[in-house]
Amino acid sequence: MRAIVHALKYEGRRSLAVPLAMLMRERGADLLDGAHAAVPVPLHPSRRRARGFNQAADLAKHLGLPISPALRRVRATEAQAGLPAARRHGNVRGAFVATRAAAQFRGRTILLVDDVSTTGATLEACARALKEEGIREVRALTAARVPTGGGPG
């Protein structure tokens, strides 16, 4: 799984988003059920330009939910993959804000989508921004989960 996610994210093999999303749909069916939209974890604009795409958005497109740009990354951060667990929460604190698009989901359930979760720091920061906007329930679905202490990812 690690090699597939790496190829999608760092080698630009975007076609891998389709089979990964299919696996996510199977394993996360309970999370998809009742969700009103999928919200990909946004990249900072500078990182998006450098990579050329957002892998979380590519995954979200194939989950069968409407996609919402309900989050914006307002601060560039260090890559989480290069940081020890103890620094990850501080690295992304305040990095995300809800957009106007989030308002239509007040009192509803949305699904955050990302490629990898290690400590959950990024997902927690995103969920916090959405909850502050009045989103009732924020669920999260990732293609891969790296056990804490399992190395970068």
Language-model-derived ranges and their functions:
Residues 1-112, 119-153:
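Conserved PRPP/pyrophosphate-binding segment of the phosphoribosyltransferase/PRPP-pathway fold
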